Each structure stands twice: as C-alpha cells, then as structure tokens.
Amino acid sequence: MATRSPGVVISDDEPGYDLDLFCIPNHYAEDLERVFIPHGLIMDRTERLARDVMKEMGGHHIVALCVLKGGYKFFADLLDYIKALNRNSDRSIPMTVDFIRLKSYCNDQSTGDTKVIGGDDLSTLTGKNVLIVEDIIDTGKTMQTLLSLVRQYNPKMVKVASLLVKRTPRSVGYKPDFVGFEIPDKFVVGYALDYNEYFRDLNHVCVISETGKAKYKA
C-alpha cells in the first residue's frame, strides 16, 4: 500500500508573492491580495504527480474523471504529463476520460449540499481503475459524496488526485491519494478555481481580496 504524501505543505504564515512580480490581468488588479502558488510551481508539481499516478495505477485501463468546472486546468495538465509518460514507456496502458459537474459553493463558503448537475453515464467506470481529478479539497464532504456515487458502479480501483487540500477546522478528515499542495485556510482563486465563476482565467493560484469578494459576490 503506497504511503500518502501530504504534498507540498505551505505554512500558515506563508506570505505569497507581490502581484507586481507576475503578469496579472488588469481587470483583476484590485481584486487580489497576493500570488500564492506561481504557475511554474504548479506545473512542476503536477509533473511529479503524474509519475506517482502511473506508478500506482498504471497496470490497468485508467478512466480519468474530471470534476468540473474547477478541475479542468489541473486535469488537462496532469493528463498531458501522464500521456507523455505513457507513450515513452515500454509498457503503456489505455486511458479514457469522463466528466462530472458538481456544485457545492456559494460565494466563498462550501454549502455542504453537493449537487451533481452534469456528467456522462458513469456505468463506463465498472471494472476500471478510476482517477478522480479535483481542484481543491475543502471540507471533504463533496468528495465523500462523489466517491459514494462512483463506487456504486463497481470500479476496480478508485484514487483521487487534488491540486490543493485546505487545512481547515471544517474538514471531515478526508485526504486524497495524490496531493499537489496543502494550503492554509484561505480562499484561493485562479488556475480554473473560481469565485462565482470569476478568476478562472488566471494562470497562478492567488488569494482573493475583500474588494474582490465584494465586487463579485452573488
């Protein structure tokens, strides 16, 4: 059994980086506090996660299940690295993709009420190695709900890769199998993570400002 890594642990007192050090779209200039995880660091960590995934799951057909919308950037980049490993290996395996859409946030709070509002026929997961790819684990309730749903289709194996895991007292204790970064209890946006659908077009993971929260509040 593989030991779960906490990922790159970012401390509670990590200040992040000044916005002026990076290219930030002008329309978000007043809406962010700091750059928290630069895009290059995200990509380097994702490349290593791809290797870990293939080491643990690469013996059988993998179905990569993307949790939309926030997971799509991480999903695309992770799969690019996995595909590169697959085509350069002496032993390659088939890989297919599926998508599911969940809703559990309003403004900056997880509602605790997870709704499946889109997705393909999950019966295709039966007997497969399933890799669920998520942007962030906050309380963990959303992922527990999704795992219960997926397991109804009797996959051979289910593993979860999450770019971010938040340290929060609201956590139910769930930890994914593959973690990019463990972060403090801050509301972050960018790299497809949104605040009421805004900020998905940022390359970096950033901390939203109070001005930004007020501006884009639902």
Curated annotation (Swiss-Prot):
GO molecular function per UniProt: guanine phosphoribosyltransferase activity; hypoxanthine phosphoribosyltransferase activity; magnesium ion binding; nucleotide binding
Residues found modified as N6-acetyllysine: 103
GO CC terms: cytosol
KW Ribonucleoprotein (keyword) present: no
EC number: 2.4.2.8
PROSITE patterns listed in its UniProt record: PUR_PYR_PR_TRANSFER
First-tier enzyme category under EC: transferase
Cross-link annotation Glycyl lysine isopeptide (Lys-Gly) (interchain with G-Cter in SUMO1), location: 115
Residues at the active site: 138
Cross-link (Glycyl lysine isopeptide (Lys-Gly) (interchain with G-Cter in SUMO2)): 115
Cofactor section: Mg(2+)
Keywords, alphabetical: Acetylation, Cytoplasm, Glycosyltransferase, Isopeptide bond, Magnesium, Metal-binding, Nucleotide-binding, Phosphoprotein, Purine salvage, Transferase, Ubl conjugation
Modified residues (Phosphothreonine): 142
GO biological process, one term: IMP metabolic process
The protein's annotated pathway: Purine metabolism; IMP biosynthesis via salvage pathway; IMP from hypoxanthine: step 1/1
The UniProt record lists the keyword Cytoplasm: yes
Catalytic activity: IMP + diphosphate = hypoxanthine + 5-phospho-alpha-D-ribose 1-diphosphate; GMP + diphosphate = guanine + 5-phospho-alpha-D-ribose 1-diphosphate
Cofactor note: Binds 2 magnesium ions per subunit. The magnesium ions are essentially bound to the substrate and have few direct interactions with the protein.
Residues modified to N-acetylalanine: 2
Residues at which GMP binds: 69, 134-142, 166, 186-188, 194
Task performed by this protein: Converts guanine to guanosine monophosphate, and hypoxanthine to inosine monophosphate. Transfers the 5-phosphoribosyl group from 5-phosphoribosylpyrophosphate onto the purine. Plays a central role in the generation of purine nucleotides through the purine salvage pathway.
Self-association and partners: Homotetramer.
Family affiliation: Belongs to the purine/pyrimidine phosphoribosyltransferase family.
Protein name: Hypoxanthine-guanine phosphoribosyltransferase
Species of provenance: Pan troglodytes
